């Protein structure tokens, strides 16, 4: 086997296959600089298909969730079509990623990507679509509940001193109401100021006295903050109360939550 290879050959192989630099170099070294044999090498290793698919948009897939020993994990695994998302190999990959994360308490998605890269590449070659380990989250707590709405929406919520029935209802509420923050006080100043500037511009068209405009803007901002904060949202199971009211009645509080929706913010 050759120990070095001409960069011109690497460039040509990349141009013909779309495979990455290192994959092309390795294939050429293993095939002693023979382009055609290197192409076959890439195909056999699965690198050719995987590299060509890497930029394909993945906005289908599934949300996976699992709880074990006071640890909850949630994963969004993407593919290109709904058909592949139902493939057993795709489902097994998602489930195995969660098992690995739970057993080793892995919090870093990049670590999971490294561990499962060869498995991902192999699956890309088999199904002919790009597969993307898009996002992952781990939470810890004494009382964790997981809720999946089909495979498209997933919620993990951690609470203290809250029975499973109420915790399930709150998880379902989170799935439906899409809160972004736990409490109004958690809303970032950046998010608040961006919305404030929008409301300020909208108010200029109302032709109202400045003191009245201030009240209008303040009212809209309060509504905005409440709408994106879990504890201030009207509880979907009992809309005359807020989620905060339900928690207070049960002498409990939510420690953390995470909500994934399939394909969120993925370019179409």
Swiss-Prot record:
> Function, please?
Associates with the EF-Tu.GDP complex and induces the exchange of GDP to GTP. It remains bound to the aminoacyl-tRNA.EF-Tu.GTP complex up to the GTP hydrolysis stage on the ribosome.
What is the species listed in this Swiss-Prot or TrEMBL entry? Buchnera aphidicola subsp. Acyrthosiphon pisum (strain APS) (Acyrthosiphon pisum symbiotic bacterium)
Q: GO terms for CC?
A: cytoplasm
- List the keywords (alphabetical): Cytoplasm, Elongation factor, Protein biosynthesis
Subcellular location(s) of the protein: Cytoplasm
User: What is any Pfam family matched here?
Assistant: EF_TS
Protein's name in the database: Elongation factor Ts
Chain residue ranges for the region called Involved in Mg(2+) ion dislocation from EF-Tu: 81-84
- Fetch the PROSITE patterns from UniProt: EF_TS_1, EF_TS_2
Which one of the record's GO molecular function terms can you name? translation elongation factor activity
Database matches in InterPro entries: EF-Ts_dimer_sf, Transl_elong_EFTs/EF1B, Transl_elong_EFTs/EF1B_dimer, Transl_elong_Ts_CS, UBA-like_sf
Gene responsible for this protein: tsf
Regarding protein family, the annotation reads:
Belongs to the EF-Ts family.
């Amino acid at each position: 086997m050759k120990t070095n290879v001409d960069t011109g050959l690497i460039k040509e192989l990349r141009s013909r296959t779309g495979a990455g630099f290192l994959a092309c170099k390795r294939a050429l070294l293993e095939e002693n600089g023979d382009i055609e044999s290197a192409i076959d090498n890439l195909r056999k290793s699965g690198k050719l298909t995987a590299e060509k698919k890497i930029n394909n948009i993945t906005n289908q897939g599934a949300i996976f969730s699992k709880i074990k020993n006071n640890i909850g994990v949630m994963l969004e695994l993407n593919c290109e079509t709904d058909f592949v998302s139902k493939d057993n190999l795709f489902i097994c990959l998602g489930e195995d990623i969660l098992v690995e994360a739970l057993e080793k308490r892995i919090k870093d998605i990049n670590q999971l990507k490294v561990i499962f890269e060869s498995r991902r590449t192999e699956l890309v070659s088999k199904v002919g679509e790009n597969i993307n380990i898009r996002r992952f989250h781990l939470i810890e707590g004494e009382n964790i509940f997981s809720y999946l709405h089909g495979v498209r929406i997933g919620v993990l919520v951690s609470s203290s001193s809250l029975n499973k029935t109420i915790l399930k209802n709150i998880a379902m509420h989170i799935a439906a109401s899409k809160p972004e923050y736990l409490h109004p006080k958690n809303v970032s100043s950046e998010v608040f100021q961006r919305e404030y500037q929008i409301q300020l511009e909208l108010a200029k068209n109302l032709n109202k006295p400045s003191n009245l405009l201030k009240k209008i803007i303040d009212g809209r901002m309060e509504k905005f903050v409440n709408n994106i904060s879990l504890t201030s949202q009207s509880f979907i199971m009992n809309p005359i109360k807020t989620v905060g009211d339900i928690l207070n009645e049960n002498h409990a509080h939510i420690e953390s939550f995470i909500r994934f929706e399939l394909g969120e913010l993925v370019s179409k």
